[in-house]
């Protein structure tokens, strides 16, 4: 991660959860990392970054530094959202942003922004001239994944009686059973006029058990001056590398979740 994420595993991670309880101590840490850095295909002009009002909620507002550019970009809109795609240099990667038409509380935004909504707008997007205001931001998050994976049906890897991880570590037939005790994801993302730099690492602590269309000439506005979602995507494979949300650029953002 080029030093952006440090101390993802600490000595204390290999101590029993309750010292003196007789519980097993972790015996293995699995680390998965991803790093991304790229300039914009069409850079924002630093001299045009200005302080603007940023509506953090329906009845709340602060200020944020918003970058500006006017470029030919893929854009779409429906009754609920605006969609914008900004390519990085080389155009294999892009930033996608989903901006609600109205200022919404973050939980309502997350409930409305379904995968189908994003997919439909992405397919409908056409290249046209877009006037863009986008905040600069930097975020650093740490998210526990045990509960999330459990809700996705992966409970067994955290169960000392059901986990079957021996083949992954070439365990001996007589070795103690290995299971996941916890899983954490650390992410760091910075977005500015030049481009985006992002890094993430996922750690699991294991325990031994005793196409574009014709462009449209009329410019449209995509002014991200209220909470929105963002995604860093590998375009050829449509793989999602990072995802998160911005509620207050001055205070950071929601989890930047990698999908390496």
Predicted regions and their residues:
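Non-catalytic, conformational "gating/processing" segments within enzyme and secreted inhibitor domains
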Residues: 1-103, 123-215
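Soluble, non-membrane globular domain cores that form compact, hydrophobic packing
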Residues: 11, 105, 109, 117-121, ...
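Extended hydrophobic
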Residues: 30, 82-98, 213-259
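Catalytic and substrate-binding regions of extracellular carbohydrate-active enzymes
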Residues: 114
């Amino acid at each position: 991660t080029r030093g952006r994420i440090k101390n993802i595993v600490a000595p204390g991670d290999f101590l029993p959860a309750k010292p003196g309880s007789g519980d097993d101590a972790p015996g293995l840490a699995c680390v998965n990392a991803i790093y991304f850095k790229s300039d914009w295909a069409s850079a924002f002009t630093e001299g045009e970054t200005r302080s603007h009002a940023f509506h953090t909620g329906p009845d709340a507002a602060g200020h944020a530094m918003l970058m500006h550019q006017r470029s030919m970009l893929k854009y779409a809109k429906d009754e609920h959202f605006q969609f914008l795609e900004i390519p990085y240099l080389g155009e294999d990667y892009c930033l996608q942003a989903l901006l609600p038409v109205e200022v919404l509380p973050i939980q309502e935004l997350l409930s409305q922004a379904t995968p189908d909504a994003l997919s439909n707008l992405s397919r409908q997007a056409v290249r046209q001239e877009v006037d863009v205001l986008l905040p600069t931001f930097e975020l650093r998050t740490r998210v526990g994944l045990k509960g999330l994976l459990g809700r996705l049906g992966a409970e067994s890897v955290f169960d000392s009686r059901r986990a079957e991880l021996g083949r992954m570590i070439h365990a001996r037939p007589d070795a103690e059973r290995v299971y996941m005790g916890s899983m954490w994801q650390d992410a760091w993302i910075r977005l500015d006029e030049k481009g985006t730099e992002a890094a993430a690492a996922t750690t699991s602590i294991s325990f031994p058990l005793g196409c574009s269309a014709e462009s449209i000439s009329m410019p449209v506005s995509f002014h991200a001056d209220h909470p929105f979602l963002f995604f860093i995507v590998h375009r050829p494979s449509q793989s999602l590398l990072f995802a998160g949300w911005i509620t207050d650029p001055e205070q950071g953002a929601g989890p930047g979740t990698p999908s390496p």
